[in-house]
Amino acid sequence: MRRRRAGGRTMVERASKFVLVVAGSACFMLILYQYAGPGLSLGAPGGRVPPDDLDLFPTPDPHYEKKYYFPVRELERSLRFDMKGDDVIVFLHIQKTGGTTFGRHLVQNVRLEVPCDCRPGQKKCTCYRPNRRETWLFSRFSTGWSCGLHADWTELTNCVPGVLDRRDPAGLRSPRKFYYITLLRDPVSRYLSEWRHVQRGATWKTSLHMCDGRTPTPEELPPCYEGTDWSGCTLQEFMDCPYNLANNRQVRMLADLSLVGCYNLSFIPESKRAQLLLESAKKNLRGMAFFGLTEFQRKTQYLFERTFNLKFIRPFMQYNSTRAGGVEVDEDTIRHIEELNDLDMQLYDYAKDLFQQRYQYKRQLERREQRLRNREERLLHRSKEALPREDPEEPGRVPTEDYMSHIIEKW
């Protein structure tokens, strides 16, 4: 009787110990996962998630309604950018669109075989190709304002080839291929930001505005102020100047100004001039290798990376600010700014739709390709499992015992 009781107690103790071991193991695994789980992937080598699997980018809106029709060729935008060849990225920097931040990303934040050499105290970085001492990037922070301060499309397309030929003589090699890129911004936000910048003393008066081989005359481009700058100007004064280049700046800087007689307003009627500028800006925007939107930083990063097959080291940050840039602006004033920038409003509406459609197209294409890869992997796995196995039994192999009985006996 005592032996039975002793045996019963022993079995109970063994079972209790087993339960404690299992519970302790579960708690340990839970704690381990809490600390290490976010960075672990059971299927990834070394337990780390590959950078490409970290989805930093927003999910496309499935209910997005397209406003304009764009053929697939306008949405694909996948280039074979050859950094070791003769390809050059040209950044058209429009004032107050976030171009300074993006320009720094290009020289400091792109994962490159040979990173740009950016030294403290110097305004420009050296961005050489991996195989020779030639620049692959034409921008403010790499080549400086070589075609003039904030050069526009008309200036850059006529100036960049000559500047690079003087810097890096082409010799007998094939001609360079230029990939133009830019950023756009909501016109009201951009306009208010430019006013605040001018109010603090900015002028951009050293800009050349070169067109058809000459700069505009004072009669073609009168100043909005007298003196060295326009610091302290009110928003009303800023809006009242009919010659203010802030009005429809994005359209003007993206259009081919030669089509409208440059800055000669008497060349063609105003209504026709406006329509030609808008259509030219749209055409040139479509023809660019890439453009981003200030209001969509992560999507801008995504499209740039997929277009040029280049990766940024750190993700872009979205800094949301008010339209008025910290200044109270009533609805009537906003409507007036929209009227002054009617061409920019139309261009931005067009650009935003093209941008969103490109993003959706790229994401859908990637998901489709991922599903195909997963399907191929499953089929390959099944085909391997279906192969006949002819492995002979190992001599002297003992049949596996019941796991629970084995653990209890060990205790």
UniProtKB/Swiss-Prot annotation:
Subcellular location: Membrane
The keyword Membrane belongs to this UniProt entry's keyword annotation: yes
Reactions the enzyme catalyzes: alpha-D-glucosaminyl-[heparan sulfate](n) + 3'-phosphoadenylyl sulfate = 6-sulfo-alpha-D-glucosaminyl-[heparan sulfate](n) + adenosine 3',5'-bisphosphate + H(+)
Annotated membrane topology: Single-pass type II membrane protein
Keywords assigned: Coiled coil, Glycoprotein, Membrane, Signal-anchor, Transferase, Transmembrane, Transmembrane helix
Enzyme class: transferase
Matches recorded under InterPro entries: Heparan_SO4-6-sulfoTrfase, P-loop_NTPase, Sulfotransferase
GO-annotated molecular function: heparan sulfate 6-sulfotransferase activity
Pfam families noted in UniProt: Sulfotransfer_2
Recorded family membership: Belongs to the sulfotransferase 6 family.
Stated name of the protein: Heparan-sulfate 6-O-sulfotransferase 1
Gene name tied to this protein: Hs6st1
